[in-house]
């Protein structure tokens, strides 16, 4: 694909030491691994408790490719989930901290952002506790609806259309 050719040229010219991709599914990652002389070191994807990304996570781990989460709190949708609220109360932390630490314990790099000082502070304090195996399982089981924030339909509403930016996921 054109994007892989451009990534390869950028690397060959010494303009990039490493290559990262975004929203790549397993087939796209395989293509990148087979086509590029240097494999991607990271794949940025939507990753939160309401979506099942276990297939891409396992594949990425098997290829030593880090996953980098965006929408880690599902644009606030997780704030409505009682399971996450109960875990947050038990640990005396916020619901976003629960979700971000869940991703961290799964080996995913979390990209979090906020303009509110309290939330920024919370984002820095996701490593001060540990989720139990049972809690990790409870959180992982929240993905039954497979709730996506970024969908082809939502991207097609953009001007210009950006639906091609969102692949059919695994």
For each feature predicted by the language model, list its residue ranges.
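Beta/alpha (TIM)-barrel catalytic core signal, keyed to glycine-rich beta->alpha loops juxtaposed to Asp/Glu
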Residues: 1-170
């Amino acid at each position: 694909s054109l994007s892989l050719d451009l990534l390869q040229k950028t690397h060959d010219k010494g303009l990039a030491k490493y290559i990262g991709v975004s929203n790549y599914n397993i087939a796209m990652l395989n293509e990148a691994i087979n086509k590029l002389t240097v494999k991607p070191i990271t794949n940025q994807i939507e990753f939160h408790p309401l979506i099942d990304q276990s297939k891409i996570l396992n594949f990425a781990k098997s290829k030593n490719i880090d996953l980098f989460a965006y929408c880690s709190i599902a644009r606030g949708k997780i704030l409505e989930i009682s399971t996450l609220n109960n875990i947050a109360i038990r640990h005396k932390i916020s619901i976003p901290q629960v979700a971000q630490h869940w991703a961290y314990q799964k080996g995913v790099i979390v990209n979090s952002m906020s303009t509110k000082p309290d939330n920024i502070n919370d984002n820095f304090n996701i490593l001060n506790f540990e989720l139990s195996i049972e809690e990790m399982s409870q959180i992982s089981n929240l993905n039954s609806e497979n709730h996506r924030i970024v969908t082809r339909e939502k991207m097609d509403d953009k001007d210009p259309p950006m639906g091609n930016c969102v692949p059919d996921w695994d």
